[in-house]
Each structure stands twice: as C-alpha cells, then as structure tokens.
Amino acid sequence: LIERSEIEAIFYSKKYEEIIEKIKYNDKNKLKHLISMDSDIHLEGIYSQKELIEKGKELVEAGNREFIDSKINPEEMGIMLFTSGTTSKSKVVALSHRNLVTNIMDLASVLDIDSNDRMLSFLPLHHVYECTVGMLLSMYVGAERSFCDGIRHIVENLNEYKITYAAFVPAIYESMYKNVKRTLEKEGRLEQVRKLMQEYKDKSMEEKKEVFKEIHNMFGGNIRTFVSGAAALDKGVIETFRNWGINLYQAYGLTETSPVIGIETKENSRVGSIGKALPHVNAKIEDANEEGIGELVVKGPSVMLGYYNDEEATKEVMTDGWFYTGDLAKIDEDGYI
C-alpha cells in the first residue's frame, strides 16, 4: 500500500514500530519522513511528533507564516483511500479537497445538527463514512466529538458523553433493538410497549420521547439523531426506533463519492429509501426496467478524481463525469432513491 500510494510521510504509533523498521527508506518506496506519535525525542531517521509540534510553535511565535498562509488548491487530491478489494486488487480512490468539503457542507445543510451537538465516533477514521459523516462534519459545525472505547462500550459511552448524534452501521442498531426487546421481555412489558407504540404511532417525536423515556435512557437519554450507513438496515428496526421517538435515518454512498449520495432527513424521510440526493449530487437511473429499476449513476463535485495511477479502472466506472455505482436503484416521483 505504501509503494502504490507513493506516500512520503507516515505518522505511526508504537504498535507499528517493527513494521516501520522493516520498510523505512528503502528503494521500493518514496518515504522521506517517519514521525513517531509516541517517542519524546528524535531517533535515527525518525522524528518525534511531540518535538515537531514544539518546533512548529516556536516558528509561528517567531513570525513564520509559511504554513498559516499556504494556499490549498481545491482540485488537488486531499486524501487517498484503499477500497476493500473483495473482487480484485484494491483500488486507490483519490478524493480532492473539493470532493470532501462539498460532501461535508451538503450534509450540514440538510441535517439538523449544530455546535450544540455531541457526537460519537465508532468506526475507524480511515473509513470514509466515519471520516466525513463523523469527524469532518463535527469539525465543520463545531460539534463536540468523543471517541468510543469499543463495541462493548457504545451504550456506556452514549450515556457518559451525553451523545446527541451518532453514525453507526446497521449491525449496531440491530443489536440495540434486540437488547431493548430482550429487556422488555424479561420485565414482562413487551406487549404493553407494543400497544403504546401503536397508540402513539402518529404522534410527534417529542410526545413519543416522553412516553418512551425509559427506552431513550437506555441510549443515554440525549440522542436526537442516529444515522445508519454502509449497508441496508431492516425496515422494521427503523420503524421501531422512530416509534420510540428516535430519529433513525438511512444514508447511502460509496468511497468514490466522498461518500454520501443520499440521506434521509427530518424534512425528507421515507422508510425503505435512502432519502433524496444531496444538494450537489445529480442522480439518475440508467437502463431502467419496467419497474424503473436500473443502475444508479451520479455526477457532481463530490465524485472522486479517479483511481490513483489507474486510468483504465477509472474509465470503467466514469463517463463524462458520471460515476456508475454498480448498484440497482429506482428514483420515485418525489425524488426518493
């Protein structure tokens, strides 16, 4: 991966010291800078992150503005991400600064989220879903972000950090749903809650939240919005969460699209869909059958630059700026995908 990406610098933790020793500065890669995040001092051929930060502070205090005044070309590659490579050798997705910023700003414009929110990171940051929908979005809106201690501690962290917004994968929500159901069964209150859910089905989210306050407390008591992505989530789970008064929205996208293409929101929500395309995403269906189902094709400033150093692979999925997702979909008369 280091050779294919042609990177020149690596920030690494103690866990990867042995690997770094084996690969550093050889003829097969273009590495120029190795930065240890744990070492307090410079070692042979290796920088200390701590010392570099201190040296940078000294330069800024002395009037050096080289970094502060540096210009960023929005069309240049800002990040590269490796695909999973389940069908062939993994590809290197090249995303520009404009790709990422467009997706972040689009999300901020449609989601009910601001600087008063507290968000929880669970997925790895090299996963574009967590990187954009999680870390970068929270930085853009000024929200507080906490990092999960692990899958077994999700509920504990939701409570501890008073989380109001979180983006997880379907398996997490399915597990939450089962845990609530198991608790209610154990207490002999499952049927009672089901009747209440039916009774309050068409009530406001605030009314539901008050009635199902005990269930809300199982998730920390502060959650306003959950987002599910990376795979399809069972309709029944979505409907149940919403009947409890918890906004659970589906999102869809790919690494190549920075990643979000469509997402449900407070204003545009329909169970079974992934909402409508983001403001700067043009979406259409190619080769639709009689039911309107065909390949989802998208275009816009959040679509990747291409696959790094792989023009052939890029041409296979992109034509005249349109990216062919390889996924079947339909777009209804209201614009829901």
Walk through the language-model features, giving the residues of each.
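Short gly/Ser/Thr-rich phosphate-binding loop of adenylate-forming enzymes
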Residues: 39, 194-246
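Conserved AMP-binding A3 loop
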Residues: 78-104
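Conserved AMP-binding/adenylation subdomain of ANL enzymes
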Residues: 101-118, 125-214, 222
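Conserved pre-ATP/AMP-binding loop-to-beta segment of ANL
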Residues: 36, 57-82, 89, 112-118
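Conserved ATP-binding/catalytic segment of the ANL
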Residues: 277, 284-286, 290-337
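Adenylate-forming
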Residues: 103-107, 175-180, 226-227, 235-239, ...
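Structural core segment of the AMP-binding/adenylate-forming
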Residues: 1-54
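Active-site loops of AMP-binding adenylate-forming
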Residues: 97, 233-235, 242-247, 254-272, ...
